């Protein structure tokens, strides 16, 4: 039975930066207030680019770093909650076309919010272990600025745009060790984009009530996220007879520094183990984890064989954890 390995990672962010000081001119807030409560200092915002553009640029680099030819990629899966188009075509189809991948390639989207990248890993791993595919391109891409209400200070300060991509390939070394995913839709309305689907179709009333934007009950989500993320990590470590010290890098979803710190401290991860990018990117939903992996890869921390523990929680609710050995070449060797 073949095993699957993450053999390359890459990310892309748009050029424009929106700082906390910019928000001081837009809503009733301050840099001090935002940093203290979220850890976010800035975020990147796409002006002319759309989600598939962001995903294409990250994916192009991921393929290049993998050492594969584009013709060897046999599936493209994109996780996003801000697709180019509400219904169709999928963002993955557009990215595959933009990249000039094989005609007829398997391409589809998933929606798992901030847990999207871990769901992508599980799908890619399953396709490869089953023998159905050999090289799967996975992408978390978001233009969250298109679904953010910039008059709502409780949400607009949190989110940014960006994309992260990885190539998952059949390999006998540095394999994906384990992945756990889960969901609970009973509290879906605590983190939701209510409008423009079949529940509240696009209309003057939908737009008037700002139902086309992200709505979040922040305090409730915070409490559930900390408990759920901690439990998810404990379960996957226990299932694999591992301890926190067996992990080289803990890479949580970059939503809020208070959530990250609470989970890190509960699980006894050190500052050196924890990868943080929330200050410069904000919450980029499904792109958050691959962007964080890429940052630690490009600065030389993550190397071939590094053991990574990924952990995420998002709307749905969805959550999940993954343990894997990084299978790509060292950045210094590219």
Swiss-Prot record:
EC number(s) from the headed UniProt entry: 2.3.1.180
* BP GO annotations: fatty acid biosynthetic process; secondary metabolite biosynthetic process
Main location class: cytoplasm
Q: Which UniProt key words apply to this protein?
A: Acyltransferase, Cytoplasm, Fatty acid biosynthesis, Fatty acid metabolism, Lipid biosynthesis, Lipid metabolism, Multifunctional enzyme, Transferase
Query: Span of the secretion signal?
Result: none
- Reaction catalysis annotation: malonyl-[ACP] + acetyl-CoA + H(+) = 3-oxobutanoyl-[ACP] + CO2 + CoA
Q: Where in the cell is it found?
A: Cytoplasm
* Coiled-coil parts of chain: none
- Identify the metabolic or biological route this protein is part of: Lipid metabolism; fatty acid biosynthesis
Q: Where is this region: ACP-binding?
A: 254-258
| Keyword Iron-sulfur set for record | no
Q: Which enzyme class, named as a word?
A: transferase
**Which residues catalyse the reaction?**
114, 253, 283
- A Gene Ontology CC term for this entry? cytoplasm
The GO molecular function terms of this record are: 3-oxoacyl-[acyl-carrier-protein] synthase activity; beta-ketoacyl-acyl-carrier-protein synthase III activity
Please give the family membership noted in the entry.
Belongs to the thiolase-like superfamily. FabH family.
| Subunit architecture | Homodimer.
Q: Which PANTHER family match?
A: 3-OXOACYL-[ACYL-CARRIER-PROTEIN] SYNTHASE 3, BETA-KETOACYL-[ACYL-CARRIER-PROTEIN] SYNTHASE III
Q: What does this protein do?
A: Catalyzes the condensation reaction of fatty acid synthesis by the addition to an acyl acceptor of two carbons from malonyl-ACP. Catalyzes the first condensation reaction which initiates fatty acid synthesis and may therefore play a role in governing the total rate of fatty acid production. Possesses both acetoacetyl-ACP synthase and acetyl transacylase activities. Its substrate specificity determines the biosynthesis of branched-chain and/or straight-chain of fatty acids.
Quoted from the entry, the domain comment is: The last Arg residue of the ACP-binding site is essential for the weak association between ACP/AcpP and FabH.
Protein's name according to its UniProt entry: Beta-ketoacyl-[acyl-carrier-protein] synthase III
> What organism does the UniProt record list as the source?
Campylobacter concisus (strain 13826)
